[in-house]
Design a protein with these regions (language model features):
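C-terminal, well-structured catalytic/ligand-binding subdomain of enzymes
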Residues: 1-60, 65-66, 76-109, 115, ...
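Short, well-structured beta-strand/strand-turn elements
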Residues: 128-129
C-alpha cells in the first residue's frame, strides 16, 4: 500500500518483543510491539529463565502499538495530563473497565476500521496503567485516522483522572460536519 504509520519510543532503554497473534474465532491476526519492562523484565538483560519466559506469555496483552490483518494500526502515546503531568485516566461510569494496553489489544483483535476502534473505546471506562496517562493514534487502510484522548473539562477538575471523557480528533472533516468543536489532525 501507500500508507505509512510511524511512531517512536522515548524510553532510554527497552527490551522489545515483536508479537504475532492469530486468535481466530472472528478476531484479527496482528503484529504488535511490546516493551517487556511492562511485564517486569529488565531492559538490560536477556529473557533466559523459565520464570522470565513464563512472564512473556502475557506479552500479547501489553502492546504499545501494532497492526492487524484488516489494516488497522494503533499506537499508544503518553499524554502528560493532570497534577504533575502524569495522572492516569481513571474514568468512573457504569461502563465495563479496561486498561490502556488491553484497549489496544481489543482494537487490534476486533477493529476493521478507525470507526470500529472508536466504537470499541466508547464502550469502556479507561483506567491507564503504569502510573501514566495515554492517548492513542489509530489509522486504517483507507487513510482514515483519529486520535483518541481522554481529557477533563479543564485543568482544575482533573486532579485524579476520574472525570475525563473520550475526545476523538478525526483527520476527515466530513465526519465532523455536525460538530462545531473539532480540529483536523
Amino acid at each position: 500500500g501507500d500508507r505509512v504509520f510511524g511512531r517512536n519510543y522515548d524510553f532510554s532503554a527497552t527490551n522489545t518483543a515483536i508479537v504475532y497473534t492469530d486468535p481466530g474465532e472472528g478476531r484479527h491476526a496482528s503484529y504488535s510491539t511490546i516493551d517487556l519492562s511492562f511485564l517486569g523484565l529488565d531492559a538490560d538483560k536477556d529473557v533466559e529463565t523459565i520464570g522470565q519466559k513464563f512472564l512473556t506469555l502475557a506479552a500479547p496483552y501489553v502492546p504499545l502499538d501494532g497492526i492487524n490483518d484488516a489494516g488497522v494500526a494503533c499506537g499508544i502515546f503518553m499524554s502528560y495530563q493532570g497534577e504533575g503531568k502524569g495522572t492516569p485516566t481513571d474514568t468512573q461510569t457504569d461502563r465495563p473497565d479496561i486498561t490502556s494496553t488491553t484497549l489496544l489489544r481489543l482494537i487490534l483483535d476486533y477493529a476493521d476500521s478507525v470507526e470500529d476502534a472508536v466504537a470499541l473505546a466508547q464502550q469502556y471506562d479507561l483506567h491507564d496503567s503504569a502510573s501514566s496517562c495515554f492517548h492513542y493514534m489509530v489509522a486504517d487502510s483507507t487513510g482514515r485516522s483519529a486520535i483518541l484522548e481522554w481529557v477533563g473539562t479543564d485543568a482544575d477538575h482533573d486532579a485524579d483522572g476520574a472525570q475525563r471523557q473520550l475526545n476523538v480528533l478525526w483527520n476527515d472533516t466530513d465526519a465532523l460536519s455536525d460538530s462545531a468543536d473539532w480540529q483536523v489532525v
